[in-house]
Amino acid sequence: DEWLKSHIAFILPCAYACYAVDGELSRTTVEQRRMIVDAAWECCEMLKAAGVPVNDAENTDRYREGTKQRKKTERMVYWMAQTVVGKWCISDHAMRAVSEMQYLDEAFAALRATTLVEMTAWDELRRAG
C-alpha cells in the first residue's frame, strides 16, 4: 500500500503535466517540471498526514527541496521530458489510460480530503491538465 501510493504520488503530477501539453512532454516548461517534483513532495506529506506510512529515504527525500536526491529527480524528469523514454513511460500511458488516471485522481482527492495539507503545486498542475 505504501509503495503503491508513494509511486502514484509521482505518477499523477506527471500525468497532469502530460495532459497540459497534450501528451507532448518536450513542451513542458522548466516550471512545470519543477512543479511535478514539488507536487510529489506535497503528496508524500499528504499521505503521511492521512496516516499512510511513507519511506522518507525512498520517497519524500527524493522530492524535498535542497537534497541531492531532489537534484537527481529534477534531472530525471528533464531527461524523461526530452526523450522517447518519457513518451513510453509517461505520455503513452497517461494519454491511453485516461479513465485509470481519473480514478486515481479521485481516490487521491478523497484521501486528501481527510487532511489539511496544502498542495499548491499539485493543485496548479491538476488545474492545468
Where are these regions (language model features)?
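Active-site-proximal catalytic alpha-helix in oxidoreductases
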Residues: 2-27, 31-44
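NAD(P)-dependent Rossmann-like dehydrogenase/reductase catalytic/cofactor-binding core
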Residues: 37, 41-129
